Amino acid sequence: SVKSEVDNFDKHLKAESAPFNNE
């Protein structure tokens, strides 16, 4: 569903930005 796709996209986005935020 679109909801799950958006959730997955958001999770990937947070996972990718986490290292940058931690520095």
Swiss-Prot record:
Residues 1-15 have a biased composition (Basic and acidic residues). It is found in: Secreted. GO terms for biological process: lipid transport. Keywords: Lipid transport, Lipid-binding, Secreted, Transport. Residues 1-23 are annotated as: Disordered. GO terms for molecular function: lipid binding. It comes from the Eukaryota. Expressed in hemolymph. One of its GO terms (cellular component) is extracellular space. Constitutes the major component of lipophorin, which mediates transport for various types of lipids in hemolymph. Acts by forming lipoprotein particles that bind lipoproteins and lipids. This is Apolipophorin-1. The lineage of its organism: Eukaryota, Metazoa, Ecdysozoa, Arthropoda, Hexapoda.
